[in-house]
């Protein structure tokens, strides 16, 4: 039953505060917390994400305009942009990383039985990165090129619910393939990635972990065909081969057989060649798995459009990582809310509702239920439409 709480407070009721306190205790610092706690900092930054604030002054102005409601938002400390700036600058960003990761664990359990379009018993992950440009003059620690700064957001997306299972924030110079060294591969799971992650020594390590990969083959791949499996060309398949690598270095790095699947995309008149270490799934399913990689592209597009990760409230590495991890925590929190309330509304729709109603004393459950699409007017799915963009890779 609705208790008359503000919508913002109802949303934050879904936060595991005991977990948050453990994260804070794990990274003690010297920054004073008596008048502006870590939770105050998180709530202010979450408010900024949910209401699309553009600057610290913007956050301060909006919250001071509602100063009588701050207590009911859960914010106990006084609001000043200098205080928030100092907190972002000095409080360890790993507090918010660990808290976001704990929310991710909760969300993945909630979405564990969701389907992503393919009937598989395996967990399927899509791996990719996105670059967030920064002004080198303001962010000198984030040097990317001679006159350009950037950070990279490396993400392993669990396609059941589109929940990030692994996130790493690095400077823009870190090559994507190095991220494979930091992932604990799960036996029996699939890892779908583009050609930028092809390093046969690392892929062989994934193979030895009894996990599976699906990737695009490079045009200069040197190999020898061992066997050709029968195919149905009416499905778009052109070959399903067992191969071994013949290049001196690749042959040494990946000494066992691979599977090579060629698929013709009639819509774009393009041949796509895939490599995998899985020999059990149908060849067409391998091609369909790679198409699912576009879910991680959608994830990056979504958070860049709907969360504040391109305009930063601080310039230090600590402040930037704090803002990014709180943005991720907000994304996952909304995903948790959606599942717990059993809502058919999209995350985008829920975010739009929250941005307009945070200071209202309306039932959050009712708001989300009313936002669900009318079953008599089915919504078009962007998910399948995005599969067509495979021709761009």
Regions found by a protein language model. Give the residues of each.
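Major-groove recognition helix of helix-turn-helix-like DNA-binding domains
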Residues: 72-91, 101
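Single, function-defining residue in the core of a domain
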Residues: 1-58, 62, 91, 98-99, ...
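Short Lys/Arg-enriched helix C-cap and helix-to-coil transition segments
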Residues: 95-107
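Short alpha-helical linear motifs
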Residues: 82-86, 107-111, 372-377
């Amino acid at each position: 039953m609705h208790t008359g709480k503000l919508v913002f407070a109802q949303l934050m009721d879904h936060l595991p505060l005991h977990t948050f306190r453990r994260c804070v205790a794990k990274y003690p610092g010297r920054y004073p917390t008596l008048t502006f706690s870590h939770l105050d900092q998180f709530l202010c930054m979450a408010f900024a994400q949910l209401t699309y604030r553009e600057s610290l002054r913007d956050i301060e102005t909006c919250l001071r305009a509602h100063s009588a409601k701050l207590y009911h938002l859960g914010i106990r400390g006084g609001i000043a942009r200098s205080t928030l700036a100092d907190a972002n600058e000095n409080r360890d960003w790993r507090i918010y990383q660990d808290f976001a990761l704990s929310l991710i664990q909760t969300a993945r359990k909630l979405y564990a039985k969701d389907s992503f379009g393919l009937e598989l018993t395996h967990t399927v992950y899509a791996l990719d990165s996105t670059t967030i440009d920064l002004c080198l003059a303001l962010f000198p620690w984030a040097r990317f090129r001679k006159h350009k700064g950037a950070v990279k957001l490396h993400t392993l997306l669990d396609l059941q619910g589109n929940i990030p299972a692994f996130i790493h924030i690095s400077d823009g110079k870190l090559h994507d393939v190095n991220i494979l060294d930091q992932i604990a591969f799960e036996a029996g799971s699939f890892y779908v990635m583009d050609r930028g992650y092809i390093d046969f020594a690392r892929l062989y390590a994934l193979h030895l972990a009894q996990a599976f990969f699906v990737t695009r083959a490079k045009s200069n791949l040197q190999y020898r065909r061992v066997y050709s499996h029968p195919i149905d060309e009416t499905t778009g398949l052109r070959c399903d081969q067992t191969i071994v690598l013949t290049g001196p270095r690749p042959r040494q790095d990946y000494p066992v057989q691979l599977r090579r699947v060629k698929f013709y995309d009639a819509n774009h008149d393009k041949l796509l060649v895939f490599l995998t270490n899985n020999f059990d799934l149908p060849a067409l399913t391998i091609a369909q798995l790679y198409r699912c990689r576009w879910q991680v592209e959608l994830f990056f597009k979504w958070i860049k459009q709907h969360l504040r990760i391109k305009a930063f409230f601080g310039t230090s590495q600590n402040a930037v990582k704090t803002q990014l991890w709180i943005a991720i925590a907000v994304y996952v929190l909304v995903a948790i809310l959606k599942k717990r309330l059993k809502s058919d509304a999209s995350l985008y729709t829920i975010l739009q509702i929250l941005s307009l109603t945070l200071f209202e004393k309306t039932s959050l459950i009712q708001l989300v239920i009313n936002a669900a699409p009318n079953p008599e007017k089915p919504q078009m799915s962007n998910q399948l439409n995005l599969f067509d963009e495979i021709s761009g890779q």
